[in-house]
A protein has these predicted regions:
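Charged docking surfaces used in two-component/phosphorelay signaling
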Residues: 15-23
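Short hydrophobic/Thr-rich beta-strand motif most characteristic of the beta2 strand and flanking loop
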Residues: 25-32, 40
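Acidic catalytic/metal-coordinating carboxylates
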Residues: 32-36, 59-65
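Receiver (REC) domain active-site loop signature in two-component systems and cognate sites
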Residues: 55
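Alpha4 helix (beta4-alpha4-beta5 surface) of REC/receiver domains from two-component response regulators
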Residues: 62, 85-100, 110
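C-terminal output helix
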Residues: 106-115
Length: 124
């Protein structure tokens, strides 16, 4: 079974995202911030990470930079999520290593489409 690490400082948002991924037959792991997410990745690298951009302790972009430097090219797919629809912010996230960019609130159909694009779920 594929795994998804859901990283968001909002417990409610993590639960919604976990439900979406569970419905897509993913096992889910949760982290409240980037620092917790790095620990989770060191323990077991997930297949995909759903990453909030704005969190305390370590932002999503800082997490991406740390993850990419630690994994040296052998890294999971990262879906970067935020409420910002700002081209500069999107560019910074992509440059830091995000594979896809999704605006909140989460949408199951969009997440499934993004996963299908990268071969992590069967397209319907």
């Amino acid at each position: 079974m594929k795994t998804c690490l859901v990283v968001d400082d909002s417990r409610v948002i993590r639960k919604v995202a976990c439900r979406i991924f569970s419905d897509l037959s993913y096992q889910t792991v949760e982290a409240e911030n980037g620092a917790e997410a790095l620990v989770a990745c060191r323990r077991q690298m997930p297949d995909v990470i759903l990453l909030d951009g704005h969190m305390p302790q370590m932002s999503g972009i800082d997490f991406l930079r740390s993850l990419r430097s630690e994994t040296k090219g052998n890294h999971p797919i990262v879906l970067y999520c935020t409420t910002e629809n700002d081209v500069a912010h999107i560019g910074e996230a992509m440059a830091a290593g995000a594979d896809e960019y999704i605006l909140k609130p989460y949408d199951k159909v969009l997440i499934e489409a993004k996963l299908a694009e990268v071969g992590l779920v069967q397209a319907r």
